[in-house]
A protein has these predicted regions:
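N-terminal beta-strand motif that seeds the catalytic metal site of vicinal oxygen chelate
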Residues: 1-17, 63-68, 123-142
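Core segments of cupin and vicinal oxygen chelate
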Residues: 1-4, 10-49
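Loop/turn position at the start of each blade in beta-propeller repeats
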Residues: 4, 61, 100-102
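N-terminal, well-ordered alpha-helical segments
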Residues: 7, 21, 38-40, 53, ...
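Vicinal oxygen chelate
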Residues: 13-17, 68-111
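Conserved short beta-strand elements that form part of the metal-binding/catalytic scaffold
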Residues: 30-64, 114-121
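Intrinsic, low-complexity N-terminal interaction/targeting segments
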Residues: 51-54, 84, 95, 106, ...
Length: 142
């Protein structure tokens, strides 16, 4: 049991239009969803999951959380016990707290950073496919 990889990062942005423009046109990310709260979800072209970056409107820039992906949903319960045994409070967030994402284990480190673990997120595949793929999409802009 262990963490597979960083699944997504959620950041606060003060100018959503400028941020989306930067991530799409300069870095080449792709918007995959916008929710009713004004959050914008983006993915890199070689990402398999629905999103890897969440932009949240805010009056100051900063990080909301970093989410790590684990292999199985059942591992979240074991991680909850392990994290709590280390003296860190946790909260299990229900499926759908974030769009297209299963339940998540949320905890805050003594440093004040908010982390989450999850196992399930909608799988959409890459922009180049997996059978003899091009090294990058034809329309990449970043």
């Amino acid at each position: 049991m262990g963490v597979l990889r960083i699944g997504h990062v959620s950041i606060k942005v003060m100018d959503m239009d400028a941020a989306v423009q930067h991530y799409e046109k300069v870095l080449g990310l792709k918007t995959t969803h916008k929710d009713a709260d004004g959050n914008v979800y983006l993915k890199c072209w070689d990402e398999w999951d629905k999103y890897s970056l969440i932009l949240t409107p805010s009056d100051q820039a900063g990080f909301n959380h970093v989410a790590f992906k684990v292999e199985k949903d059942s591992e979240l319960d074991a991680f909850q016990q392990r994290v709590e045994a280390a003296g860190v409070k946790t909260q299990m967030l229900s499926e759908g707290t974030l769009p297209f994402t299963g339940r998540m284990l949320q905890f805050q480190l003594p440093s004040g950073h908010d982390f989450r673990l999850y196992a399930q997120k909608e799988f959409v595949g890459t922009d180049v496919g997996s059978t003899n793929p091009d090294p990058w999409p034809d329309d990449i802009r970043g």
